[in-house]
From Swiss-Prot:
Protein name as annotated: Matrix protein
Keyword Membrane: yes
Function: Plays a major role in assembly and budding of virion. Completely covers the ribonucleoprotein coil and keep it in condensed bullet-shaped form. Inhibits viral transcription and stimulates replication.
Keywords from the UniProt entry: Apoptosis, Host membrane, Membrane, Viral envelope protein, Viral matrix protein, Virion
GO cellular component, one term: virion membrane
Localization, UniProt: Virion membrane; Host endomembrane system
Signal peptide location: none
Domain of life: Viruses
Disulphide linkage map: none
Protein's membrane topology: Peripheral membrane protein
Entry annotated with the keyword Thylakoid: no
Originating species: Lettuce necrotic yellows virus (isolate 318)
Subunit text: Homomultimer. Interacts with nucleoprotein and with the cytoplasmic domain of glycoprotein.
Gene Ontology MF terms in the entry: structural constituent of virion
Length: 177
């Protein structure tokens, strides 16, 4: 059984997402900026009802297409010298997915708000400006020649719905046959 894959172009127009922290739960301690955990925590909060898009973004981050930098910055809330983790998004990507994504452009201002992760307090803020458009299968070959590096492959957790492990243990189902 094979799932039908739809092709999409996703653009990130001036998308900026950051997490700032001043200090840890104990005086003099700095909270670690655990980028992937902050990103996942933020995704589940921002995209509560759009789990398929959260899945794609989480996989883009874990595979290095959305990267992050750590720096000292002047935070509007925490003041100068705050430790900041800022996520850098590509300008555009082309992906096949088994999910049906809602097309259009969405802009969302992430007002500064408190995020607590592992007893550390972070201030999350930013701007998400994301466009999603569908691509006809007949156009994929031409676009791939012109915009090759922007084709990043499937970012679904399990695009074909293949059961690779038994729910009861970690043994591979195929190996047990």
């Amino acid at each position: 059984m094979s799932a039908k894959l739809n092709w999409y172009r996703i653009t990130f127009n001036d998308t900026v997402w950051r997490f700032d922290t001043a200090r840890g739960p104990k005086d003099g301690e700095t909270c670690p900026l655990i980028a992937s955990e902050l990103f996942s925590s933020g995704l589940s909060e921002v995209f509560k009802s759009v789990t398929s898009f959260s899945e794609i973004l989480r996989n883009m981050e874990s595979r290095g297409y959305i990267t992050n930098i750590t720096l000292r910055a002047d935070s509007d809330i925490l003041g100068p010298g705050a430790l900041r983790c800022e996520f850098l998004f590509p300008s555009e990507v082309f992906i096949p997915t088994s999910h049906t994504l809602k097309m259009g452009r969405s802009s969302l201002i992430l007002e500064p708000h408190l995020v607590v992760l592992k007893e550390c307090k972070y201030i999350s803020s930013g701007k998400l400006d994301i466009g999603i458009s569908s691509i006809e299968a007949t156009s994929v070959a031409v676009l791939r020649r012109v915009k090759g590096p922007a084709f990043i492959g499937c970012m679904d957790d399990n695009p074909f719905g293949v059961l690779t492990k038994k729910p009861s243990d970690e043994k591979n189902v195929l190996a047990s046959k």
